[in-house]
Amino acid sequence: MFFGTFTPKLDDKGRLTLPAKFREELKDGLMVVKGQDHSLAIYPREEFLLRARKAAAASRSNPQARAFVRNLAASADEQDLDSQGRISVSAAHREYAGLKKECVVIGSVDFLEIWDAQAWEEYSAAHEADFAAGDDEAFANFL
């Protein structure tokens, strides 16, 4: 599971060092895909494949679901961590997420999110009231 907030820097070659505490769960490979709110999502390879198969099976008759699966699959970048725990973030993914040098990696329970630091700060500020107010549906299984 993935928890916490980290602030790695994107290097000049588009590589990002992932936090050491997450590397064991990603040692068998990972998938980088477009995420929600112009972030990137990183899933352990096997977790992603399970989810992708479920989504693909459910999407055959629903046009919105088919579009989601197509976009998800088209954005998927299968990778392995290098010896220093880095991934290469493609130019297309950097552009989609607006990544510059300063990044934020957050644990989102079963996957990671990569954000541009400024975008994460703005998103967090804009949604602080939502978190503080709580959401019975969102928190029903947690509280």
UniProtKB/Swiss-Prot annotation:
Residues 5-47, 76-119 form the SpoVT-AbrB domain. One of its GO terms (biological process) is negative regulation of DNA-templated transcription initiation. GO terms for molecular function: DNA-binding transcription factor activity; transcription cis-regulatory region binding. Disulfide bonds: none annotated. One of its GO terms (cellular component) is nucleoid. It is found in: Cytoplasm, Nucleoid. Its main location: cytoplasm. Keywords: Cytoplasm, DNA-binding, Repeat, Transcription, Transcription regulation. InterPro entries: MraZ (IPR003444), MraZ_C (IPR035644), MraZ_dom (IPR020603), MraZ_N (IPR035642), MraZ_sf (IPR038619), SpoVT-AbrB_dom (IPR007159), SpoVT-AbrB_sf (IPR037914). Belongs to the MraZ family. Forms oligomers. NCBIfam families: division/cell wall cluster transcriptional repressor MraZ. HAMAP family: MraZ (MF_01008). PANTHER family: TRANSCRIPTIONAL REGULATOR MRAZ (PTHR34701:SF1). This is Transcriptional regulator MraZ. It comes from Corynebacterium urealyticum (strain ATCC 43042 / DSM 7109). The gene is mraZ.
